């Protein structure tokens, strides 16, 4: 290892230097810092957060919320996040921690904050608040795309209970069997932002949460063939909506080419729902559950969707939020 020079020390301690290039992580955190409505989200959590009393004062709420979002963005467990904050200057800057005068919140503190959000179902309220902020910038249009994605869970019984998670179930997709849960979402057909979500076990059919994924003002509803022939469910929630779900094209040994072409045109719009899943599963890393039970993982899913909406809207709304 090279001897630590003055320039290296300045770079490590302050992050400045003539030869230094801003990293993609720093650029991402700077952009999220501008986009996230911190005051509104803190107002959602504040009624349930510990108040200052005679004992040790609680850590600032916004700081804990920033750390919680860092865990989602970089798919970090509690202990891994604590160590990452000690290791990364860019993360400490985003959170607002100065190691010269204070320490990083430990893993137990992060665990208790997450349990607070789970206990009061604040992940869903954070998702709703971010959705409201996005609606203020770009109102919901007249179409909704509905879809579901599988989130895997450990199927092994080699654990203390010698059993799998009883709230998770298995289902078949094509010729492959999966064990876990399903994340159902409703996405605005114009903006591509998620406005509703439901978490179920994997064996629940896609059509059952359909009414909960509609806001009621739709003119069109898009979905894959799993939602075919569900006009009654759609009109029960959105009376003016037209059914634009994909139709089944194979009849015995023949293929309906007309229906196939129509499905292809619908899928050009329907594909926007995959952008949300790509951010949640590929960028945020939420491909497998981290906790037991649906409630804890649902809280993570709602926060992940809220952050995905902010990420997907960054190009359109960054200019509006810059000082």
Region roles according to the model:
Residues 276-279, 283-286, 309, 313-320:
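Hydrophobic alpha-helical segments
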Residues 63-75:
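Alpha-helical support elements that line or immediately flank enzyme active sites
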Residues 1-39, 46-47, 319-322:
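Charged, often Cys/His-bearing segments associated with DNA-binding zinc-finger transcription factors
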Residues 54-61, 292-301:
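Structural motif
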């Amino acid at each position: 290892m090279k001897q630590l020079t003055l320039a290296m020390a300045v770079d490590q301690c302050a992050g400045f230097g003539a030869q230094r290039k801003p990293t993609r992580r720093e650029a991402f955190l700077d952009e999220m810092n501008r986009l996230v409505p911190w005051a509104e989200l803190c107002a959602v959590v504040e009624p349930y957060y510990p108040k200052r009393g005679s004992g040790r004062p609680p850590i600032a709420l916004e700081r804990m919320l920033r750390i919680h979002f860092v865990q989602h963005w970089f798919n970090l467990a509690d202990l891994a996040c604590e160590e990452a904050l000690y290791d990364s200057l860019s993360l400490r800057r985003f959170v607002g921690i100065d190691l010269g005068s204070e320490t990083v919140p430990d893993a137990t503190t992060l665990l208790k904050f997450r349990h607070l959000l789970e206990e009061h179902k604040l992940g869903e309220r954070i998702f709703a608040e971010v959705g409201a902020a996005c609606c203020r910038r770009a109102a919901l249009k007249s179409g909704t795309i509905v879809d579901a994605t599988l989130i895997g869970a450990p199927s092994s019984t080699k654990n203390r209970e010698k059993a799998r998670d009883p709230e998770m179930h298995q289902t078949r997709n094509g010729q492959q069997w999966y064990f876990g849960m399903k994340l159902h979402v409703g996405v605005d057909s114009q903006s591509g932002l998620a406005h509703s979500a439901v978490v179920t076990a994997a064996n629940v059919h896609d059509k059952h949460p359909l009414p909960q994924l509609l806001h009621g003002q739709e003119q069109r509803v898009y979905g894959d063939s799993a939602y075919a022939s569900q006009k009654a469910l759609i009109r029960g929630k959105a009376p003016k909506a037209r059914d634009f779900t994909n139709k089944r094209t194979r009849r015995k040994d023949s293929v309906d080419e007309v229906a196939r072409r129509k499905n292809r045109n619908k899928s050009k719009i329907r594909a926007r729902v995959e952008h949300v899943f790509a951010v949640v599963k590929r960028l945020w890393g939420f491909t497998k559950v981290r906790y037991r039970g649906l409630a804890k993982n649902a809280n993570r899913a709602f926060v992940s969707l809220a952050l995905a909406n902010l990420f997907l809207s960054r190009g359109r709304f960054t200019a509006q939020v810059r000082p």
